[in-house]
Amino acid sequence: MEYSYPLNPDWTTEEMTIVVQFLEAIERAYEKGIDTVELKDKYKEFKQVVPAKGEEKRIGIDFEKASGYSAYKVMQLVKNATTSKIKMQP
């Protein structure tokens, strides 16, 4: 898919990388499946860059509009996961 990630131009390169890695993990949850621990770790790093719930929600909505992938739905599934790997159903 061709789309751009919702990034804040005020972030450092390292912060942008962390956000992109989290969004790529969301993509993997839909496309191939992902280890729940890995995704939780990516989310913790993401929250260091984006601590505000409002900004997290805005990024999630913008990402879903661009990609069709819901970070919110993935994280809800991870929160309640009983398996070591998750894969979202389209």
Curated annotation (Swiss-Prot):
Q: Which InterPro entries match?
A: BH2638-like_sf (IPR023324), UPF0223 (IPR007920)
User: What domain of life does the native source organism fall in?
Assistant: Bacteria
Q: Name one Pfam family in it.
A: UPF0223
Give the UniProt family note.
Belongs to the UPF0223 family.
Enumerate the NCBIfam families for this protein: PRK04387.1
Name by which UniProt lists this protein:
UPF0223 protein lwe1035
Show the taxonomic lineage.
Bacteria, Bacillati, Bacillota, Bacilli, Bacillales
